[in-house]
A protein has these predicted regions:
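Non-heme di-metal
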Residues: 2-241
């Protein structure tokens, strides 16, 4: 049986229901409500992201040298596990369709988690998503750069995604998803702020600043190069401020 959380089985591509749903996301008009397949593709990717964060942060707990950071990441990891369950419960049930089919990452999500996991981000066609010469940065990210990436790239982009989705959710048809988004957003913002305070305390030397911003710059380049704009997951509708 396939594992919906295995990146090797859910690499982004033009085929499959998830890709069809994301294509529908891109083609929805500014005022149209989210359709069933669009909503399923979004919620399925949220589930994938939250489960991936649960597993990744659980791994990082044993690699962080400071006890306070370990405690923070352990608690945050458990919240991400709960978020994944919330989104799993809100995947639509359609005749003849396995809800796990929707649990798949898009290209920006795949690239982001490859870099955070210490792997060289995947290629798009014949060209790598990562800028040339960045392989060592992604193969050996330090504890502090990873902590900063979580709270200065991942959570801010995830919060933006959830907020944009919430703005477009219909109070009639999307009430269960909107409720889950509000619950998850509350946790994400709290973890983001607590993590940012921690990063600011730990970045205490010029070397720390250089290491953090080198990793953040390359990580943002990877995510943007994979197609991300506002947030991490593509949401239909106009972006405020554009």
């Amino acid at each position: 049986m396939s594992d919906p959380f295995d990146p090797t089985e859910n690499a982004p591509g033009p085929a499959g229901l998830h890709a069809a749903g994301l294509h529908a996301v891109e083609s929805v008009s500014d005022t149209a409500p989210l359709g069933l397949e669009v909503s399923a593709a979004l919620v399925g990717e949220y589930r994938w992201i939250e489960h991936a964060l649960y597993r990744l942060l659980g791994q990082w707990v044993t690699e962080m040298p400071i006890a306070a950071v370990q405690v923070h990441l352990d608690a945050q990891s458990m919240r991400h596990a709960w978020h994944a369950e919330l989104f799993a419960d809100r995947l639509p049930v359609m005749a003849g369709a396995d809800p796990d089919v929707w649990t798949a990452p898009s290209a920006p999500t795949t690239a982001l988690f490859a870099a955070l996991s210490g792997s060289t981000p995947p290629t798009t066609g014949s060209a790598p998503i990562a800028p040339s010469g960045d392989e060592d940065v992604f193969e050996h990210p330090g504890a502090l750069p990873r902590l900063a990436a979580l709270h200065r790239v991942v959570l801010p982009r995830l919060v933006t995604t959830y907020e944009l989705h919430l703005q477009l959710a219909s109070p009639m048809t999307d009430a269960p998803v909107a409720r889950a988004l509000r619950l998850v957003l509350n946790d994400e913002v709290e973890d983001w702020q607590a993590g940012e305070r921690m990063v600011e305390r730990l970045v205490s030397r010029p070397h720390d600043v250089a290491a953090v911003y080198q990793f953040l710059q390359r990580l943002e380049a990877v995510v943007v190069g994979a197609g991300a704009t506002s947030g991490l997951v593509a949401i239909p509708g106009p972006v405020p401020g554009d």
